[in-house]
Amino acid sequence: MRHYAAYGSNLDPDRMRAYCPHSPMVGTGWLEGWRLTFAGEDVIGWEGAVCTIVESPGDRVFVALYDLHPWDAAELERVEGVTAGTYRKLHVRVATLDGEVTAWVYVFAGYEGGLPTAWYLSELANAAQKAGAPDDYVAQLRSHPTRTASA
């Protein structure tokens, strides 16, 4: 299996191309029964929390699917913090217009909770927009509460 389902800043095809130049975006879809949330505030050295997903019946998360080339896999795991234990890799089913696809995602390895910074939330919403997420999904991201940055 080579499909990677991106739900955060890696929704942006330009960002992914910088880390994974051999791994094109091949489509989009939804993780049914999952919810986008935030976690790890003050844990990984950021000002705010980072995005992750948690199982949540009735919810869904927009994803971009990438055909991840083996040459790019190690770099992506390093960038996503898998090798440091910050994120863990899970296999999921992605609902697409062509049917279900099996892919993997990276999920934060710690607790759920915390608020993202306004800058980070804007990056996520912009990435979702670039990947073709529906307008209401992007608007929902943009309206999420944010943490006030420290001085």
Where are the language model's segments positioned?
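Glycine-aromatic micro-motifs
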Residues: 1-151
